[in-house]
């Protein structure tokens, strides 16, 4: 089991490095989540967490090409589930905001004296990359706002499917086309030349207000979101729910996902009561005032071509299924680890 854990840590970290540092995907979200959950289960079973395990750290180191900067408050990942009942028990009797979990690149904006002064990517949650010049050419970001204090907010930079398709149509080389809007967005936001960013039609969807001294929001996240709209920001669409109205809201979101022009990979539940949510604190990795819901894994039928036996670094021989390529979450998949031949 320890050897399998070492192998999982290595594979997951390689995938994270490729994704966060090199803007490329070497495994699909689905495969990453499956391996991650296997590692979590083994860690729980053995009581051991290896150094470097992705279950105890977030993201990867930012690259050196753009200036780096530490976030004023660390950006933790969200705990997540695919089970609606887990979401229901999290929500309980609390008034909760249920919103899209946007699938792009998280960016933190700072305004001073009504002017955008800084934009920093999420990076590894502790240190991000400064992309202020690029943020200034996002399609819908307000460069000036009425509020004159120091405003810090978080949101997701995204590229809409319609824009993604137009950009891909202009690329003649099939191999050079982008696999999905998230990859294109990540590369666009982290450009060294913001003229390129400007051509990519990046949108910013605000999802969290970090601080706005002097403003009274009546201890309500809803009031914060409405205030951000008044300042000129486009905010992520949300519904206010309790456990009793959760099913109706889930139905609304699940039906709308089919026609959305923006990429999302689930939903986020956040308590409206700011003081209560903050009083819960955090675990080593997750805040306790929010929870993410992931849609059921995308499934595709394909044809198994052969089974290969792949020796791991530890000497174990693992079966690998080779099949006709299928698109899963925007990534072409043609191989997958299997547990046994039967």
Task: Kindly give the residue locations of the regions a language model identified.
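RNA/tRNA-interacting regions in translation and RNA-turnover enzymes
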Residues: 1-342
């Amino acid at each position: 089991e320890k050897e399998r854990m070492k192998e999982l840590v290595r594979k997951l970290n390689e995938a994270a490095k490729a994704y966060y540092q090199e803007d490329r995907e070497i495994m699909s979200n689905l495969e990453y989540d499956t391996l991650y959950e296997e590692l979590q289960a083994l860690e729980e079973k053995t009581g051991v967490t290896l150094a470097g395990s992705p279950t105890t750290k977030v993201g990867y180191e930012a690259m050196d090409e753009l200036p780096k900067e530490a976030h004023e408050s660390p950006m933790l990942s969200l705990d997540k589930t695919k089970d609606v009942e887990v979401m229901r028990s999290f929500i309980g009797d609390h008034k909760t905001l249920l919103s899209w979990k946007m699938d792009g690149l998280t960016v933190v904006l700072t305004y001073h004296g009504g002017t955008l002064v800084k934009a920093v990517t999420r990076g590894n949650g502790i240190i991000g990359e400064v992309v202020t010049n690029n943020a200034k050419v996002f399609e819908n970001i307000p460069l000036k706002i009425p509020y004159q204090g120091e405003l810090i907010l978080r949101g997701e930079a995204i590229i809409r499917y319609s824009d993604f398709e137009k950009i891909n149509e202009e690329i003649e080389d099939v191999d050079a086309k982008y696999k999905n809007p998230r990859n294109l967005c990540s590369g666009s936001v982290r450009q060294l030349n913001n003229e390129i960013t400007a051509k990519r039609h990046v949108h910013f969807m605000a999802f969290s207000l970090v601080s706005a001294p002097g403003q009274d929001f009546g201890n309500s996240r809803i009031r914060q979101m409405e205030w951000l709209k008044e300042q000129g920001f486009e905010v992520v669409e949300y519904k206010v729910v309790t456990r009793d109205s959760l099913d109706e809201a889930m139905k609304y979101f699940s039906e709308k996902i089919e026609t959305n022009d923006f990429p999302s990979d689930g939903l986020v539940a956040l308590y409206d009561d700011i003081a209560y949510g903050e009083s819960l604190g955090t675990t080593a990795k997750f805040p306790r005032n929010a929870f993410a819901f992931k849609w059921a894994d995308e499934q595709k039928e394909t044809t198994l071509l052969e089974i290969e036996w792949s020796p791991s670094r530890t000497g174990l021989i693992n079966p690998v299924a080779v099949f006709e390529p299928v698109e899963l979450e925007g990534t072409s998949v043609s191989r997958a680890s299997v547990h046994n031949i039967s």
